[in-house]
């Protein structure tokens, strides 16, 4: 047998994967800090006790207790809920279910969350971008002009990394523009910090609306990797065709069900109250730093701030063990750093470090 024209492992891989730049998660970027304010996590751990002892059995595909608890919490029917390995899997499922590689596209509006782009590129689906306007609101005309061939439109509200809500009237206009043309995915990962802004009540009006949620932020369970997709039953049934047979392990489902109990939800709301209080303390302290240009309003558990010399500020705090998220490479975010709201002690360390920075 001939061994001519043999291919390397890299040659055997798909071309788009060879060229792919992976999403740079906070943990992937590393660092040796002791104050981690770069991943929008809750700053302290929540304790749970496992109640299920059936690890010899495969778990349910869609654990009933988790689905029912989340449906009650979100104000929707259980048939309108899908649980997955974080909201990131929900992004991937939407693209896999609705986009033909090499034919269809997704559309998103930077600056925004990076996994929309990475998921599409991994699957081989084209990406279209319509940058937001100067106030980080939707460019509706630009979206309309680029809708042809776009099957899924991703909108993050509150937006990561800018922290602001998308104008609800603009969201309604977007849903009307896309009716019969594309699915609209509203990423509500941070909605617990502004629950009045959820679009869950709109599902009955818009069959093409899909909402992503997570337990990673206000529920303080980033390490659990548990997210939710809210949509009309027809959409959920399509997603069930492409999701893995066992997306949640038994321990994950056990803890998620506890977190979504009345007691767990009350605890989450108390955490939100504390974070909002600490967010204001952090903002007040930042405004006294000479190196600060502007701190932007936020509806989330993080703030975005522009500095006169953000690269040196980022490195200086990094060297002091304070790890922030550099947003310089995002469109329209030159000079910006994103800071997760931490504990009072962590926030004060940030404030003190920034006050010591030169102009």
From Swiss-Prot:
EC assignment: 2.6.1.9
Pathway involvement of the protein, from the record: Amino-acid biosynthesis; L-histidine biosynthesis; L-histidine from 5-phospho-alpha-D-ribose 1-diphosphate: step 7/9
Coiled coil: none
Domain of life (superkingdom): Bacteria
Cofactor: pyridoxal 5'-phosphate
Enzyme class: transferase
Pfam families for this protein: Aminotran_1_2
Record field: catalytic activity: L-histidinol phosphate + 2-oxoglutarate = 3-(imidazol-4-yl)-2-oxopropyl phosphate + L-glutamate
GO molecular function list: histidinol-phosphate transaminase activity; pyridoxal phosphate binding
Key words of the record: Amino-acid biosynthesis, Aminotransferase, Histidine biosynthesis, Pyridoxal phosphate, Transferase
Annotated GO biological process: L-histidine biosynthetic process
Record-listed N6-(pyridoxal phosphate)lysine modification sites: 217
UniProt similarity note: Belongs to the class-II pyridoxal-phosphate-dependent aminotransferase family. Histidinol-phosphate aminotransferase subfamily.
HAMAP family from the UniProt entry: HisC_aminotrans_2
Complex formation: Homodimer.
Protein name, entry field: Histidinol-phosphate aminotransferase
Organism: Salmonella arizonae (strain ATCC BAA-731 / CDC346-86 / RSK2980)
